[in-house]
Amino acid sequence: MVIGRSFGPPALADAIVELPLPGGPNERPITTGFPDKGALILQRTRPPLLETPFEVFDQSVLTPNDQFYVRWHWSVIPTEIDVGSFRLAVRGHVEKSLSLSLDEILALPHVELIAVNQCSGNSRGYFQPRVPGAQWSNGAMGNALWTGVRLRDVLDRAGVKAGAVQVRFNGLDEPVVAEAPDFMKSLDVDHARDGEVMIAYEMNGQQLALLNGFPLRLVVPGWYSTYWVKMLNDIEVLDQPDTNYWMKTAYTIPDTPHASIRPGQTDVKFVPISRMVPRSFITNIKSGDTLRAGVSTLARGIAFGGDAGVSRVEFSSDGGKSWQEAQLGTDEGKYSFRQWQIHFGLPTAGNQLLMVRCTSSSGEAQPDTPNWNSAGFMRNVIEQTAVVVA
């Protein structure tokens, strides 16, 4: 059975959205021209970079599959996959190499987990000075119920040998030219076998969309999506640290608080990016909205603790001078978005800044000032929403 979709850039944009990015361009096309996808912000066509419109996050704690963001590194992506002949290889520093069919994987004990998948460069468009790369707004993220099998169970079938150091993952996408480095990512062997890392075949109760990694994708809860390898077809156990380009050079951050340095600073050690950090957003009020003075107004939104749960969410209606604790919604697990809400009042007319701050269950709070690094990674400053009070 072959499953696939042809895809390419749409002839015309379905609509235009304005993103308040300091470095521009502010106008971006909305497209519905990609397979199994609804309305998404078009960042790039080849490889596909599609951003979730921010209003989607106000609708549910789970991000719908058809509006889940898309990010690929190479443009050579299979447009159809024969599920009958597909195999997942497990090899390297193991007792027995495996070549697993989808039926064999589906026969393993399944697990479910709700987890945020977020691009390392989510919100890169707000970095000042501007840095190269996709100028994402805040929609290069999504939250889904992932269903699959434990990576540990697959590795145990192969038998990881003593002395194993890391486990490397590769997918079906390919570089445009042979000289370019194949996209591969690695986890330390203990992390790979922690029982939470998953090989997923469903998201939100449906098979993975082709552009979100069908038929299999790695799920690494609490870590940035660079590790969530899509169209996973190769697992290699290594007996030495992985030094491939995507681990040693790309996706590295300054080894400093908040991964922050001064523009031009070079006297700093870089390390591979890994765990996510806390973030929170207002989803039902946007900058430029007009609110009524002297009446109770509802603010609501989402928060997540990065690699930990959400301990509390605080809201400020006066630009950070004072803070009130918001009411938290249902706890869907420590790796999930968590909804919050609060009623507040603005007594007088004028301009005001609304702010929201998340503190994780490990005690890590969002910082007051934005970080900066040359890759545009790991933004998690307290976000501000400028409103007019009338």
Predicted regions span which residues?
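N-terminal export signals
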Residues: 1-15
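Structured, non-membrane catalytic/scaffold regions adjacent to prosthetic-group chemistry
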Residues: 14-390
